[in-house]
From Swiss-Prot:
Stated name of the protein: Small ribosomal subunit protein uS8
Organism: Hahella chejuensis (strain KCTC 2396)
Keywords tagged on the record: Ribonucleoprotein, Ribosomal protein, RNA-binding, rRNA-binding
Role summary: One of the primary rRNA binding proteins, it binds directly to 16S rRNA central domain where it helps coordinate assembly of the platform of the 30S subunit.
Annotated InterPro entries: Ribosomal_uS8, Ribosomal_uS8_CS, Ribosomal_uS8_sf
Subunit text: Part of the 30S ribosomal subunit. Contacts proteins S5 and S12.
Similarity comment: family membership: Belongs to the universal ribosomal protein uS8 family.
The keyword Electron transport is annotated on this UniProt entry: no
Cellular component aspect of the GO annotation: ribonucleoprotein complex; ribosome
GO molecular function: rRNA binding; structural constituent of ribosome
Length: 130
């Protein structure tokens, strides 16, 4: 059976691993998943990630906890295959009063909503994290 929304699967795996208090989570890798993991690491939501280039590429994400609680309180898919969400730079959402981030796929790469606003580019809102 083919996977329809691989990013939603990634976010679900992260949520489930954090609820089970796992240290790491492994999943099939893709360029988009690696780009999203890179943004999560830059923003301090995960400790690290490794993308292996085997016959079947695997992405391993090391989760981050603070005083025993997961750093990522909520990670949810915004744009999905059935309903894509494209926003202009000035229409990008602020998440949780600016405490969270929206990850946006732009013509200049995958970045946070703040970086996209600063660069003056819009794009597809992939997910929100706080």
């Amino acid at each position: 059976m083919s996977m329809q929304d691989t990013l939603a699967d990634m976010f679900t795996r992260i949520r489930n691993a954090q609820m089970a208090e796992k240290e790491t989570v492994r999943m099939p890798s893709s360029k988009m998943k690696v780009a999203v993991a890179n943004v999560l690491k830059e923003e301090g939501f995960i400790t690290d990630y490794k993308a292996s280039e085997e016959a079947k590429p695997v992405l391993e994400i090391t989760l981050k906890y603070y005083q025993g609680a997961p750093v990522i309180e909520n990670i949810s898919r915004a744009s999905r295959p059935g309903l894509r969400q494209y926003k202009a730079a000035n229409d990008l959402p602020t998440v949780n009063g600016g405490l969270g981030i929206a990850i946006v796929s732009t013509s200049k790469g995958v970045m946070t909503d703040r970086a996209a606003r600063k660069a003056g580019v819009g794009g597809e809102v992939i997910c929100t994290v706080f």
